[in-house]
Each structure stands twice: as C-alpha cells, then as structure tokens.
C-alpha cells in the first residue's frame, strides 16, 4: 500500500501518527520504516520529518533498519527476567545463530529485546510478530522456531 493511501484512511491527523507508522512498517516486507517513508509521510501529512522520526524512535516496536519476516521480541521485564528470559535469549541465539538486534542471513528472523509485553502472569514471554507465547522454556521456544521454519520450507 502506498503512503498516500495509508494516510487517507486516517484523515491526515497528527493524533493518528502512530497508527499510520504501524501500517507503513507492516506494509514493508522488511518490517521497517525507511527515511524515504518518513519524508513522504511528512509531505503527505504536514508534520516535520524531525517530529515523525522522533515519535517513531521513542517506541521500540518501530525500526529504521530492515528486519526479518518474523520479529521475535523477548520480554526483559523484571518478572520475565526472574523467570528465565535470558535462557530464552540464549536458546534463540544458538538456534538461529544471531544475537540481540540481529537478523538471520536468510532474512527470516530478527531477535529483539523489549522492555515489557504486559503479560507478566505468563513469564517468561515472547512475541513473534503479533502472537504472544508465554510460560516459555528452552524446549518450547525451539519447537516454536522449528514450526515456523517448517512452515517456511527451511
């Protein structure tokens, strides 16, 4: 979808900036907001580039660099940390051969840390794209990754 079409859905209002940014990022196969996207959005909505970039950079869910098809966000909140989030990171890193903030060579996965997913009752937790997984263990996350790889023919 073109930026102009996305903006039209939201009546060019500043209060809709977050929704617009989410749609722009979701529309990009590499799951990020490019500098060109921000410049075009600025022209379309009449908000300075610096305001748009500042807003997007404040939120961890937005990225300015290309990412994988599957974005794995591991919660690092205190409850998740206490319940084993670091182990989840280690297992994912080992299985995918990437570190935090990296993308696999094939462009399939990106591993990110997020401050809180708001699902403390099921710690440790992670979100892969829009799906939340709770009560994670090393074995459980391995199975989830394997299912995704099979789905993608890897």
Regions found by a protein language model. Give the residues of each.
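Signature of N-terminal electron-transfer/Fe-S-associated modules in redox systems
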Residues: 1-154
């Amino acid at each position: 979808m073109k930026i102009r079409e996305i903006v039209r859905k939201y009546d060019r209002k500043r209060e809709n900036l977050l929704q617009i940014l989410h749609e722009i990022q979701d529309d990009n196969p590499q799951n990020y907001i490019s500098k060109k996207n921000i410049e075009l959005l600025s022209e379309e909505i009449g908000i300075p580039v610096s305001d748009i970039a500042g807003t997007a950079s404040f939120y961890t869910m937005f990225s300015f660099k290309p990412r994988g098809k599957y974005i794995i966000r591991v919660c690092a909140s205190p409850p998740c940390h206490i319940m084993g989030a670091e182990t989840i990171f280690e297992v994912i890193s080992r299985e995918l051969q990437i570190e935090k903030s990296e993308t696999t060579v094939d462009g399939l996965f990106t591993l990110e840390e997020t401050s809180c997913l708001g699902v403390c009752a099921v710690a440790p937790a992670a979100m892969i794209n829009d799906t939340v997984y709770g009560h994670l263990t090393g074995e459980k996350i391995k199975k989830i990754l394997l299912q995704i790889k099979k789905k993608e023919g890897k």
